[in-house]
């Protein structure tokens, strides 16, 4: 059990986005890091922030969306300061340094190509969800 049984007012929560960087400034403490837990369980990267295209739109649309996203990501990775200035528009009060830290937590080699480990991570997450009857079993096409 997480939290403090002696203090029912103390409630655990899942922090996402910039909360991962700023939680201590708000007097919060980390009980568990889900990314670390996932890696301990699977030895795989945690599958976050994926772009999904509905297959029924057809392969031409799927291919064009993938091309456009890849081009955009490549531009951002080749122009990091410009991309960071753009990200600051959505930074929800973060400093430039905190925004840089947050962006670089997630912009990495997996951003351009999640590889075999990334594919296994997605399939593992979906399998676990289906095993627990949270989601139906599904076939996934990863391009």
Question: Model segments located where?
Answer:
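Short loop/turn and capping residues at structural boundaries
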Residues: 16, 118, 140-141
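Secondary-structure end/capping motifs
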Residues: 58-128
